[in-house]
C-alpha cells in the first residue's frame, strides 16, 4: 500500500499550555474545521472528544494525552492535503509526565496562552520541557474576547518570562467584547469570521484605518525577522527591496525550525475565531518529519547510529505511552521514526531484549479507533498485542537493531498508603496498581517491608487522587487512603574512607569479601556514581558489579531515617579476596556494610522537597496570603501584577503544603488560585529533620 500523504506534508504537533488556557477547546475546533467532527464538543458540557476518560469529563481537565489525526487543505482550500497528527497534552502540573513524553515524539508544538492570564507557571514548565527537546513552536494567544485580554502584554511575557523571541504575524482587531477578528500582517488584510456558520466561513477586508500605523510597524519587525534567515533575503531587504509573501514565509519558517523565533497568532477558540489561521501557520512554520534531524540511537556493538525519516530505511519507533482499553486490552502508542511496520510483523525491543509480534495497528481519533494495515515513517499510531513494552522502549527491525534515547521521568515527591476496603480486594488492588504503574512512569507502587502496607507515590495530591479514582472505576477496587507522606531524601556532607569485611567460616566452604570504599558528596542532582578504582586485581573484576549492587541496595535505606541516599560518589579503591571462599554474595554484603558504616561517619543530612508555588490573589488578601506563606517556611521570590490582582511567586517545603487549597480558599473567600510543581531538594532545618528522624525510628 503506497503512502497517501507525502511525508513532507505531515505535521506531528502537540498542543501545550497552562491549565484553562483553552487547549482542549482549541483542539475541538481544529477537529471541527478539518471536518473530523460535525458537531463541536464543549469542555464545559463534558462533551469534548479529546477528553475521553470519565474523570476528565467530570473535572473539565485533560489528564492523558489523546492522539488524533486530521487533514487540512488551508483556510481558503488552496493547499494540497496536509496530514496533521495532534497530541492534546494536559496542562495540570501533576501530569507534566504526559507533556514530557508527548514532546519527546513530536516535531512541533502550538503553545496556547490565555490573553488575560498570560504566561502562567505551568506555561513556564512546559516551555522548559519543549526547550529541552528542541521542539520548534508557535504561540496562539487565546481568549481574546475575555475581559482583561491584552495581546501585546502576552507577547512581552513570552520574551521576558520564557526567554523566547516572539514575532507577531497577526494583530487582534479589538479586544474583550469588541474582539472582531485579526489582521494578517503578511498580506496586510483583515480577517472577519462569520458567527452564523460557527466560524466556518470568513471574509477578507481592508485593515481598519485606526490600525494601519500599528500594523505597518509590526509588519516591519516581522519582515526583518524573516530577512535574518539567509544572506540573500537580508541583502534584498537592506537594499530596500520588498520581500514577497512567499519569501517572508520561507524566512519565518527557517528561523522557527531553528528555534530562533516563535510566530505569534491570536484569536478566541470558544468564539470560533482564529483557529483556521493557526492551522495555516502549523503548515507554514512547523516542521515535517523530514525537517527534523535524523533520530540518533545506539546501534550494534554500542556504536552511535542514526535513522532518517523515510520509508526505505529500517524500521524504528519509540513507544511513548501505554494505555489499557476495556475492549482490546493494552494499547501501545508509538511514533514511527523510519521504515514501515505492517500488522503481523515481528519487532525487536532492545531494551527488554525481546521479540514481539504486532497484532493489530490502529490510528486513534481521541478514543475512536480506525484499524490500518501498516504505518510508515512519521506516523503516530497504537499497536495492539504487545506484552512486554514500557514507556520509552524502542521497537525496531530485528535485523537492524537500534536503541533510541530513553525518556527521563521525574521522581515522585508524594506518597500515600492505600489498602482495599475488603480483604477480598487485596489481589485485585495489586493487579490494578501494577496496570496503572505500567501506563504512567511517574507513578510508583511498593510494599513497605516493615508495615506490609502498599505505598503509592506520584507527582502531587491530584495525581494520586485520580489513580485511586481510576482504581475504583476501571477495576472495581474501593480503597482507603492514608495521610500523604513526603518523599524525603538523605545525602552526606563530607568525604570518608571505610572498610567493609564480611567473613563467615562454617564447616566446608566459607564466605569472604573485603573492600575499602571512598564515599564523597556530589553536587545536588548528581545522583549516584560508582567508580572502579581497583588496580592490580586486589578485588577480581567479576566481583566488582556485586560491590556496586550491594551499595545500591543500601542506598535505598539511608542511615538517618531510612530514606534513599542521593548525590554520592563511591570509589572502590582497595580490598582483598580468598581463592576458595570469595563469592559475589560475600562482596555484595561487604559493599553494603562498608557503605552503611561510611555514610554514618560522613555527616549525613536529611533533604526535603521544595515546591515552586505561584498564588494569584486579589490585592486585598495579599497580606494574609504572604503571612500564611511565611508561616509555612516559604520564601517569597517576587510579585507581579495581573488583571486578577497579584501573582506571588515563592518556594515552600512540600511538607507544609498539605491542605493548602482549603486554607487558601477560606482565607480569600475562594477568590485566589494557586499552582505548584517540584523544584529541588534542599537540606531540612534541624528541627524538621529531628522530628522526621524521631518519627521513623519510633
UniProtKB/Swiss-Prot annotation:
Subcellular compartments:
Cytoplasm
- Residues forming the tr-type G domain are 8-290
Keywords tagged on the record: Cytoplasm, Elongation factor, GTP-binding, Nucleotide-binding, Protein biosynthesis
Biological process (GO) annotations held by this record are: ribosome disassembly
| Molecular function in Gene Ontology | GTP binding; GTPase activity; guanosine tetraphosphate binding; translation elongation factor activity
Q: Which SUPFAM superfamilies match?
A: EF-G C-terminal domain-like, P-loop containing nucleoside triphosphate hydrolases, Ribosomal protein S5 domain 2-like, Translation proteins
For the ligand (GTP), the binding residues are 17-24, 88-92, 142-145
Q: Name one GO cellular component term.
A: cytoplasm
Answer whether the UniProt record assigns the keyword Transport to this protein.
no
PANTHER family, alphabetized: RIBOSOME-RELEASING FACTOR 2, MITOCHONDRIAL (PTHR43261:SF1), TRANSLATION ELONGATION FACTOR G-RELATED (PTHR43261)
Against HAMAP family, the record matches this protein to: EF_G_EF_2_B
Protein family (similarity comment): Belongs to the TRAFAC class translation factor GTPase superfamily. Classic translation factor GTPase family. EF-G/EF-2 subfamily.
Which NCBIfam families does UniProt cross-reference here? Answer: EF-G, PRK12740.1-5, small_GTP
- Role description: Catalyzes the GTP-dependent ribosomal translocation step during translation elongation. During this step, the ribosome changes from the pre-translocational (PRE) to the post-translocational (POST) state as the newly formed A-site-bound peptidyl-tRNA and P-site-bound deacylated tRNA move to the P and E sites, respectively. Catalyzes the coordinated movement of the two tRNA molecules, the mRNA and conformational changes in the ribosome.
Recorded protein name is Elongation factor G 2
Could you tell me which species this protein originates from? Methylococcus capsulatus (strain ATCC 33009 / NCIMB 11132 / Bath)
Instruction: Identify the coding gene.
Output: fusA2
Amino acid at each position: 500500500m503506497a503512502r497517501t500523504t507525502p511525508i513532507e506534508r505531515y505535521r506531528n504537533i502537540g498542543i501545550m499550555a497552562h491549565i484553562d488556557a483553552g487547549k482542549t477547546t482549541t483542539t475541538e475546533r481544529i477537529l471541527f474545521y478539518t471536518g473530523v467532527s460535525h458537531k463541536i464538543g464543549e469542555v464545559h458540557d463534558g462533551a469534548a472528544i479529546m477528553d475521553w476518560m470519565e474523570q476528565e469529563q467530570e473535572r473539565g481537565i485533560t489528564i492523558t494525552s489523546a492522539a488524533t489525526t486530521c487533514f487540512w487543505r488551508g483556510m481558503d482550500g488552496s493547499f494540497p492535503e496536509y496530514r496533521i497528527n495532534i497530541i492534546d497534552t494536559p496542562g495540570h502540573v501533576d501530569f507534566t509526565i504526559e507533556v514530557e513524553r508527548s514532546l519527546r515524539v513530536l516535531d512541533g508544538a502550538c503553545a496556547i496562552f490565555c490573553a488575560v492570564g498570560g504566561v502562567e507557571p505551568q506555561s513556564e514548565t512546559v516551555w522548559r520541557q519543549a526547550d529541552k527537546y528542541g521542539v520548534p513552536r508557535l504561540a496562539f494567544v487565546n481568549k481574546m474576547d475575555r475581559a482583561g485580554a491584552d495581546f501585546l502584554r502576552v507577547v512581552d511575557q513570552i520574551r521576558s518570562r520564557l526567554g523566547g523571541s516572539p514575532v507577531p504575524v497577526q494583530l487582534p482587531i479589538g479586544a474583550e467584547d469588541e474582539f472582531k477578528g485579526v489582521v494578517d500582517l503578511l498580506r496586510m488584510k483583515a480577517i472577519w469570521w462569520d458567527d452564523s456558520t460557527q466560524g466556518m466561513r470568513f471574509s477578507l477586508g481592508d485593515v481598519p484605518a485606526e490600525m494601519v500605523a500599528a500594523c505597518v510597524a509590526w509588519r516591519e519587525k516581522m519582515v526583518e525577522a524573516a530577512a535574518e534567515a539567509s544572506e540573500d533575503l537580508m541583502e534584498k531587504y537592506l537594499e530596500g527591496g520588498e520581500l514577497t509573501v512567499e519569501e517572508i514565509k520561507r524566512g519565518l519558517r527557517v528561523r522557527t525550525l531553528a528555534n530562533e523565533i516563535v510566530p505569534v497568532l491570536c484569536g478566541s477558540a470558544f468564539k470560533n475565531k482564529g483557529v483556521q489561521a493557526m492551522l495555516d501557520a502549523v503548515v507554514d512554520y512547523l516542521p515535517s518529519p523530514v525537517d527534523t534531524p535524523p533520530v540518533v540511537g545506539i546501534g550494534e556493538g554500542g556504536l552511535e547510529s542514526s535513522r532518517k525519516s523515510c520509508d526505505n530505511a529500517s524500521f524504528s519507533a519509540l513507544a511513548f505511552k501505554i494505555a489499557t482499553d476495556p475492549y482490546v486490552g493494552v494499547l501501545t502508542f508509538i511514533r514511527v521514526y523510519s521504515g514501515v511496520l505492517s500488522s503481523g510483523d515481528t519487532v525487536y525491543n532492545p531494551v527488554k531484549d525481546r521479540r514481539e509480534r504486532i497484532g493489530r495497528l490502529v490510528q486513534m481519533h481521541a478514543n475512536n479507533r480506525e484499524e490500518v494495515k501498516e504505518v510508515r515513517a512519521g506516523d503516530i499510531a497504537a499497536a495492539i498485542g504487545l506484552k512486554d513494552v514500557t514507556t520509552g522502549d524502542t521497537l525496531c527491525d530485528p535485523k537492524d537493531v537500534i536503541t533510541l534515547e530513553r525518556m527521563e521521568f521525574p521522581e515522585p515527591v508524594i506518597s500515600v498508603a492505600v489498602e482495599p476496603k475488603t480483604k477480598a480486594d487485596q489481589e485485585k488492588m495489586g493487579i490494578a496498581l501494577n496496570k496503572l504503574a505500567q501506563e504512567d512512569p511517574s507513578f510508583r507502587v511498593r510494599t513497605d517491608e516493615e508495615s506490609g502496607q502498599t505505598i503509592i507515590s506520584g507527582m502531587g495530591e491530584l495525581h494520586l487522587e485520580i489513580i485511586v479514582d481510576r482504581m475504583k472505576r476501571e477495576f472495581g477496587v474501593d480503597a482507603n487512603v492514608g495521610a500523604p507522606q513526603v518523599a524525603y531524601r538523605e545525602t552526606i556532607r563530607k568525604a570518608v574512607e571505610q572498610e567493609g569485611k564480611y567473613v563467615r567460616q562454617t564447616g566446608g566452604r566459607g564466605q569472604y569479601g573485603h573492600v575499602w570504599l571512598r564515599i564523597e558528596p556530589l553536587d545536588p542532582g548528581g545522583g549516584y556514581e560508582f567508580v572502579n578504582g581497583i588496580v592490580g586485581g586486589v578485588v577480581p573484576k567479576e566481583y566488582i558489579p556485586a560491590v556496586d549492587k550491594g551499595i545500591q541496595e543500601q542506598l535505598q535505606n539511608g542511615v538517618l531515617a531510612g530514606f534513599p541516599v542521593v548525590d554520592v560518589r563511591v570509589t572502590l579503591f582497595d580490598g582483598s579476596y580468598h581463592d576458595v571462599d570469595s563469592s559475589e554474595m560475600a562482596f555484595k554484603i561487604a559493599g553494603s556494610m562498608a557503605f552503611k558504616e561510611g555514610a554514618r561517619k560522613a555527616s549525613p543530612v536529611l533533604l526535603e522537597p521544595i515546591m515552586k508555588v505561584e498564588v494569584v490573589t486579589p490585592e486585598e488578601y495579599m497580606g494574609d496570603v504572604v503571612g500564611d506563606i511565611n508561616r509555612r517556611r516559604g520564601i517569597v521570590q517576587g510579585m507581579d501584577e495581573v488583571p486578577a490582582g497579584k501573582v506571588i511567586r515563592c518556594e515552600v517545603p512540600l511538607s507544609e503544603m498539605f491542605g493548602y487549597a482549603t486554607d487558601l480558599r477560606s482565607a480569600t473567600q475562594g477568590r485566589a488560585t494557586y499552582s505548584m510543581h517540584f523544584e529541588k531538594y534542599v537540606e531540612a532545618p534541624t528541627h524538621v529533620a529531628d522530628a522526621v528522624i524521631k518519627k521513623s525510628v519510633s
